[in-house]
Structure formats: C-alpha cells, structure tokens
C-alpha cells in the first residue's frame, strides 16, 4: 500500500492538479491531508476537488478555520463540510496508528515544534493516545524526527506554497513486511 501525505495546499490548483496526476500514475489510493486547503488564488476550487475525492482523509488547518471571507461563495453543504473537518484524527493503516494534526491542539496558528527536545515534548503532550506516528504541517518544511519515546514525527512540507516553488509531499510504503517514507520535492513541470 502506498499512502501520500500532504499539507498546506493554500488553494494552489496547479500544484493540486500535478499531485492528483502523480498519485493516479503511481496508484496511490489514500491521501492524508494535514490541512490548509484554503488560502491562495483558488481556495474554493481546490476545496471542491478535495471534498469530492474519496482518497482524501483531512484535518483542519488554520486557513480552513478562517472561512469567513469565503462565506458568500460557499454552499451550505460546503460550509458544513469545512466546519466538520476535525482538528485531529487517528488513522490505522496495517496496524500502525497515525495521528494527523495541522499544528497545536489549542491554537492552529502556533508553530507546532521548533525541533528541540523540549518543544517536541510540549507538542506531543497536546495529544494523548496510542499512536506511533505524528503527521503535522503548518511549517512548510519537510522533516522526519524519530527519537522521542519511540514516536516518529513527519512533516511533508507544503504542496502548494513551498519556500522553493516546488511541490513537496511524502509517500509511505507500507505492508506487512515494509515501512518506509519517501520525501518528494518536484518541479511543477517535472515528469518524476
């Protein structure tokens, strides 16, 4: 099974179209989306694509909470869908539990972690539960941290608003005998 992890699309339709073509070409049927669908140039169009694609499992980002500026352009069904996206959720894949979050539990705008032992501990204390992997976004930087009490922290970077104008995301290859993570950083016009 191959699973994609994305975050921080920020309404970038070109990046979303490229990504959807990539996952179709590579037979990826599950997308763990860590929030911030909205924002940018085409937030409503991006939201509609993700809302209607059953491959996407979503959590809410800080931009998704700020739907007030789009209120006149959304249908009631779309408003309800956005308001009902959870801030966190645990997904079980091949008996491995993944906590999905965008940022901090009490404030989605806070920086999740600063990659120090103390800030990681505070970040993980936000979320109680039995999970092995913590998937988070918000910083737009890819990272893999695997040293805190056996938990692995993964940030896929930003699909639509990266600092180097490339699409960034992660792929998990998972089955009974294999588990590995690939970080992808692709130019929009690339054929990777």
Question: Where are the model-predicted features located?
Answer:
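Short Pro/Gly-enriched beta-strand edge/turn motifs at strand-loop
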Residues: 72-76, 125-128, 150-158
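Active-site environment of divalent metal-dependent phosphoester hydrolases
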Residues: 10-15, 38-42, 64-68, 106-108, ...
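Beta-strand-turn-beta hairpins that frame and shape the catalytic cleft
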Residues: 1-4, 90-99, 147-152, 176-181
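Acidic, His/Gly-rich catalytic cores of divalent-metal-dependent hydrolytic chemistry
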Residues: 145-192
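Core catalytic region of metal-dependent phosphoesterases/phosphodiesterases
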Residues: 2-92
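His/acidic metal-ligating clusters that form di-metal
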Residues: 27, 77-144
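Glycine-rich His-Gly loop
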Residues: 8, 103, 158
């Amino acid at each position: 099974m191959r699973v994609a992890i994305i975050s921080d699309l920020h309404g970038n339709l070109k990046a979303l179209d490229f990504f959807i073509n990539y996952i179709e070409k590579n037979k990826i049927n599950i997308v763990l989306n860590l929030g911030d669908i909205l924002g940018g140039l085409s937030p409503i169009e991006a939201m509609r694509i993700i809302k209607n694609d059953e491959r996407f499992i979503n959590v809410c980002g800080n931009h998704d909470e700020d739907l007030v500026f789009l209120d006149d352009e959304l249908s009631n069904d779309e408003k309800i869908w956005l308001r009902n996206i959870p801030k966190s959720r645990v997904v079980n894949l091949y008996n491995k539990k993944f906590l999905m979050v965008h940022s901090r539990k009490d404030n989605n705008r806070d920086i999740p972690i600063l990659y120090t032992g103390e800030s990681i501990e505070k970040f993980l204390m936000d979320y109680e539960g039995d999970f092995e992997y913590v998937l988070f976004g918000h910083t737009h930087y890819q990272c893999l941290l695997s040293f805190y009490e056996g938990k692995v922290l993964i940030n896929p970077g930003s699909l639509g608003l990266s600092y180097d104008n490339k699409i960034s995301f992660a792929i998990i290859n998972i089955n009974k005998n294999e588990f590995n993570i690939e970080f992808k950083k692709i130019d929009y016009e690339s054929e990777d």
